Amino acid sequence: MATSVLLACGLNEQKLPGFVHISEESNVDASFLISCVLGQRLRISNAGTLLVCLQHHYQHYFNAGMRLGYNTNIFQGKTLGVIDVLSDMAGEGLASKWLTNTEGQTLTDQLVEDIRAQVERNYASRNSYTVLIDNLSILFNLGASKLQVQQFCQDLAALGKEREKLTVITKLSNSDIYQLTDNNVAKLGQVRIQVLRLKSGVFREVDGKLLIERVLDEGNYACEETRKEVLYKVNDRNVKVFAPGEIGVKV
């Protein structure tokens, strides 16, 4: 299952921090974290979740969920909402609203508008609400500028600040390439999880390293940052974590 990795990342609580950013290094796949968080949120009674599919379509998350022991179809349309950008574009082609400039709105403007509409429709009736954005990098591929992506994330962070029980979780792949954007987005939140390659290269028992950074508020003028490193291995039906050095791997 996914309990150990969520516990290591501090994402196993019913109430999550307002903004969490996942930085995915090149040649590393951090999609498992989105699937793990999704499953955890769906299991909480009356917790709402909105999944925004940019990198993978909804069916991918359904399949991943079944391997991790949960069925997204049971929750869809109830506590789970989905904005499946990828499937919309595949089904509608160039007619998709995500590929057209509607009334002068950019892609990111339209996406924020749809997310806000879903939140306003469902937030009040839920004990908590989580918005999952599976890969900001895809917005660059669809023509969004770095400034538009940054503004998109700022709008999402503002949405979270307006609502005490709302959490926004974003992921950015190739974070070492989009380093400036990645750092700017990470500064919007309280938790940053970096998914990194092993310095020693490929190892059969470990897929990579998680560096978890958390900012703890201490009044108006001071804060404390905690850092933790763990190794992880994604198996077919679970994700395991290890302490560095536990299995003799140099990181």
UniProtKB/Swiss-Prot annotation:
A cellular component term, taken from the record's GO annotations: nucleus
Function: Component of the elongator complex, which is required for multiple tRNA modifications, including mcm5U (5-methoxycarbonylmethyl uridine), mcm5s2U (5-methoxycarbonylmethyl-2-thiouridine), and ncm5U (5-carbamoylmethyl uridine). The elongator complex catalyzes formation of carboxymethyluridine in the wobble base at position 34 in tRNAs. Binding by the elongator complex stabilizes microtubules and promotes their growth.
Phenotype caused by lack of the gene: Larval lethal with developmental delay; larvae spend twice as long in third instar stage and die before pupating. Larvae display abnormal tissue morphology with reduced size brain, ring gland, salivary glands and imaginal discs. Larval neuroblasts have abnormally shaped nuclei. Formation of melanotic masses in the hemolymph of third instar larvae, increasing in size and number over time.
Keyword list, A-Z: Cytoplasm, Cytoskeleton, Microtubule, Nucleus
Coiled coil: none
Pathway: tRNA modification; 5-methoxycarbonylmethyl-2-thiouridine-tRNA biosynthesis
Name of the protein in question: Elongator complex protein 6
InterPro entries: ELP6, P-loop_NTPase
Species for this entry: Drosophila melanogaster (Fruit fly)
Single GO biological process annotation from the record: tRNA wobble uridine modification
Pfam families for this protein: ELP6 (PF09807)
More details: Named 'poly' for the abnormal shape of larval neuroblast nuclei that resemble the nuclei of mammalian polymorphonuclear leukocytes.
